[in-house]
Amino acid sequence: WYQKTISLNALLLSPLSIVWSVGNLIKKKLSKVQKIDIPVIAVGSAIIGGSGKTPSVLYICRELKKMGYIPHIISRGYGGSTTIDEVIKVKPHMDFNFVGDEALMMSNYFPTWVSKNKFHAMISAKEDGANILVLDDALQSYNVYKNISIYVYDSIQSFGNRLLVPSGPLRESVKNAIRKSQIFFLINTEVCNDLNDSHFKHILKYKIEINPEFKEKKL
C-alpha cells in the first residue's frame, strides 16, 4: 500500500476497489444526517489504520478544556465487541476486548463513549454534561452533522499509493476527504511532499506538536 509504485497485487485487486467505492457512495446517499444542538468536531483521515488520529483527539480535548469547554469523546470502539445498539461510557478498568483499546486509553483522560451508532452515543454524552463533542475517526460518518472536520495527515504514510481498499489504504478518494475538511493537522512534518497538492489550497494548515503524555485529570 505504501510503495511509491503500484504493485501487481494492487492492480489485481482493483475490481474490488470499485465495489468498495460504489458501496461507499450508496452508504453516503442513503445516510440521513442527524444533528445535535452542541458543537461537534470530527477528527479523521482517508486512510485505514493509524495516522495520529487518537493523539490528535486528546490534543483537541486538552485545548478545549483550557478554553472552558467540557469535551466528551465519541468512538466507534474499534476492536471491541459492543453491538450496534449499545452505548457504553468507557471506564479505565474495562476490558479492551469489549470497548476497544484506543477508547480505553482515551477514557483515562476524558469522558469517552463507544457505540456503533455515533449519534446515540452523542445524545448520551450531552445528557451526561458534555457541551462539545469530539468524534474519533469520523470523516466517513455520513449520518452525523459536524461543525468542523479535521483531517490528520501523517507525512510519512502520506496517502500511500492513492488507491482505494483493498488495492490501497484509502477509504475514500483524497479529493473527497480533503474537500470536506476545514483544518489539517500535520504529523511528522519533516516530510511533507504532498502539501503542494492542489486539493490542499483551501485548508487551514495547523502545525502541532503532539505530546503522548497527557497529565490532565479526568473530568
Regions found by a protein language model. Name each.
Residues 28-92, 192, 218:
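Walker A (P-loop) phosphate-binding motif
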Residues 78-196:
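Phosphate/Mg2+-binding loops and adjacent switch elements
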Residues 16, 186-219:
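Residues lining hydrophobic/aromatic ligand-binding pockets adjacent to catalytic sites
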Residues 34-37, 143, 213-214:
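Short, flexible hinge/linker loops that cap or flank conserved catalytic cores
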Residues 1-39:
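A transmembrane-helix-recognition feature enriched in membrane-embedded lipid enzymes
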Residues 37, 68, 109-110, 181, ...:
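A generic structural signal for alpha->beta connector loops
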Residues 41, 71, 131-135, 149, ...:
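Generic beta-sheet signal
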